[in-house]
Structures are given as structure tokens and as C-alpha cells.
Amino acid sequence: MLERRNIVLVSFVSLVLTGIVVAGLGTSSQKKHMKLPESSPAPAAKSDDASLAPEVKPSPIVVAKIGDYEITKDELVGRLLVEIRPHSEEYTGPWKTVSPESVLLTLVAEKAMMMEGRKTGALDDPILQAFIERQKRQKLGNRVVMDYIRQNLTVSDAEIDQMMKSRPNVTREQASMLVQRAKGIPMLEQFYKQLQAKFHYQAVKENFAKASAIHERLLLNPARPRNESWILNSQVRDDVTKEEKAIVLGTYDGGQITVKDWLDTLCEIAPPGRPKDLNTPEGVEKFLDRTLRSAMFVAEAKARGYDKDPQYLREIRDLEDEQILYKVQADKTKDLPEPNEAEVTAYFEKHKEWFANGPLVKTDQIWCQDLATARKAKEELDSGKDFNSVKESYSLQKNVQPYDTYRGGEGPFWDDLWKAEPNQVVGPMKGFYDDGLAWRVVKVLAKTPAKDRPFAEVRDGAKWTIFSERRRTLLDRYGKELRDQYKYDVYLDRIQDLDPLDVALYPPRGK
């Protein structure tokens, strides 16, 4: 229930920060059974009851270090879950074994790329800067609004019952969301007004006409021809002068809202949803409220010290690293040439079977909670029980109809499936399930051999397969160079127990 509530909270907050509020939280009776985080955790009370003691999490196991980065075993396991899964069902070569050691070295290389990117000024890129600043504001604003909602918004069972009487076609959950929306919108509007007063917000109305004129120039008379009928981010970046960007539209304690802030907010909105009255000062003022809303929540977050919170700072550092890695890899591969027609043709001729239609195996499957359950299901099938009956008793997916499986989707499990004959039941065997793996028992219904496809049908697929291989090779080589350049340590003795096909077994981690 807590997980469901937090999911809805995030949706609620993202809409609040854009001036649109739709909420869905727990009822007051549900709250009695929830442990909700506070904005500033109080010291834990002493108790002789061990069940009330705070959970002590084990220290993470560090499996590699490079610079000030530490790679934990959990991070490695998470990446293994990604790497073991096939990435394409259409164009597939031989299954490539994934080892914890190779994935760990890839992670080390990526950390080295992040270090190199920071050293060479990747964070100075204006597009990257704008993205990170936007994420910072969103995270800070989210926390303020989530704290306020948790502390102030409750919905009683009686209110839900009343809503269901007035709206007999809605479910109880839908009724709860309707009540919360009705109560939450005015509540948050009041909070927003309180923040404006707290931070002494003042509109600079004499500049609204200037903002309107800049908007009309960008929209109707772009400096360079564009195919789109709306204002682009690049126009705000390149076609608005430094002086125009700095025009102040509103002030508050510790900050101000400029034309650039106003235009940036506009460009965050999909064009069909952008206001149509920004050619007037009144339209400028109305839309300014949208920019101000985020600014007020962020100002409150900073007043509470949320921008100094270690968890927030770690999240921003991780976000920066992620974006630096993308940029470094993109810059390194931007001049990689596309394969020519002769290369694509030669590649296709050498690997025709990778681009064939099929082979495929039509299967009916019993996905099981664990190996013991799979063994029990197989024993009952071997004793002559009906497959559908056993599936109904044991499968995690009881209503899934038989479907075709492909070499690309099965990866390391394909050979065992292809060896089976129609009407044969095989297993227990592992298979890709949800975000990981699960044990299953499989009934093979039919087998269809591969059928070659003409080159014209797969030219683009072959071309991009070559390009992807070249890109991967280039980045692997670059990563090795950086690993040699930066000092690092790996602790292979700490990952000896990792089997990629075991760490992903159902149920998924965290469930």
C-alpha cells in the first residue's frame, strides 16, 4: 500500500508543479497502517522492544574502486540483470556469455569516462546544464509538495462513501482519488499563496510587454528558417540576447524570474498545450504563474535546507554522472562512419541466419514461484495430469495463451527449447520473466524452421547491427585506455559467488 501511495504522490506532485493537480493518496483509515517519512526525521525513541528498533541495513559490499567512485555488489548485480537479457528479437547472433568480471570492468570503464568528462568540462555544455538545473528544481519542489500533502491531506472513509453515492459508476479507489483532487487543489493553492507572501513576491508588470514582444518575434519571425511552427529551445538559447534573457518579470526573497526562465518553462510544454495568448501582457502574466509556482516551492525547499541534504546531493551527482557518460560516449562516437553498401552486403552474406524469419517454437508455459514448485508441476505432468490443470494450480501467469518464442528472446535457453519435439514437456528450466528470470515448465506445441529473408528486407537491420558492433568496439577500446590511465582496484574475490543466471531469479529484487 505504501508503494502504491508513493507512486500516486509522485504523479500528484509532478502535476502540482506545472499548475495541474490530480491526486490519489491513501485514506485516513489506511494511514493508520502506513509508516510515512517525515521531512525532518525525529530522533528514534528508545525502546526495549526489539521489534520497534530501526532496521539496520548491512554496509554495501564494495567490489571495485576508481578515483572517488565505489562500485558496490548491488550495483554490479543490477547491471548484470540488464546485460543478461537479449536486446533484440529480430537480428540475433550467437549468445554471448556474460560474466560478472567483464561487466564489472565495463562499470569501471564507465566511471573512468565520467571522471574524464568532468575533467574536460562536459558539465559546461549548455544543454546538459539546462537539463540538470531543471531536474534539480523538480526534485526540490517535489519534496516540498510531497511533505505538505503527507502532513495535511487526508480522506475519510465517509467522504469516499459519499462520493460513491454521488458517482455510482466509480470504484472505491477512483472515488478516493476524486475526493483527494477536490480537497487537494484548494489546499495546495492556499499553500502556494502562503509561499508568495512568505517570500514577498512582486510582479514586475512593466516588463510583461517586453516578454510578449520577444515571444512574438521568436514565434513569427525566427532568425533562421525552421520546419516547426512553435518556438524551439535552440531559439531561446541562440536568438535571445543576454540582455533580453535577464529582463526581470518577478522578484522574491533570494531570487527572481527572468524572461529566460519564462521561455524555458514554455519550451517544457508540448506545443499543442502552449498558451495562445502570449502575444498580450495579460497572457504573459497568466503564464508567469506557472513559472512562479515551481520557483516558490524551490525557494521553500532551500529555506528548509533540502538542497544541502546528502541524499539529494548524491542523486544530483548520479544524475550528472549519467549525463556526462552519455555525452562522453556520444562525442567519442559522433564521427564513426556508417558502413557502406559493400560492407553491409558482405556482412549479410556471412551471417544470413541472423536475419532469417525464425526459427521459432510455439510454447505453452507454466511460470513458477521457485524451483521446488516447478519440479512439483513437472512431476504431476509426468504422471499424466492435464497441462492446463497443472498450469491453473501453479503458474504465476494463469491466463496467458500459448505464444511463439524466438532465439533472440530466449538467449541462452534457446538450444534446450529447440531440441524438444512437438508435444514434449521440458523443464524445469529458467527463462526471462518480468525484470529477471524464473523457473518454468514448457510444453512445445510446434516448431518452425528458419526461412531466409532477402537482403532488401534486412538491409537497414544489417547496417545498424554493423554500426552498433563498431560503436561497442570503439567504446570498449576507449574504456580500456581510460582504465589504464586512471588507477583502479577490483576485488574479484567478492564476486566469486555471482552467477548471472541466478542473481536474476524470481521474485525480482526488492519485492
Where in this protein do the model-derived segments appear?
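Sec-dependent N-terminal signal peptides
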Residues: L2-S28
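Signal peptide processing junction and immediate N-terminal pro/mature segment
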Residues: V21-P41
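N-terminal targeting/tethering segments
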Residues: L36, P41-V170, D239-Q323, A450-G461, ...
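Acidic/polar surface patches and capping/hinge elements
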Residues: P37, I149-R172, Q180, E189-A203, ...
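Envelope-exposed proteins and targeting segments
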Residues: S59-V62, G67, T72, K245-V248, ...
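Buried hydrophobic packing residues in well-ordered domains
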Residues: D68, G117, M163-M164, A175, ...
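Peptidyl-prolyl cis-trans isomerase
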Residues: T97, E101, R134-D147, D161, ...
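A contiguous, mid-protein "functional segment" used to position or interact
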Residues: S176-K198, D460-L492
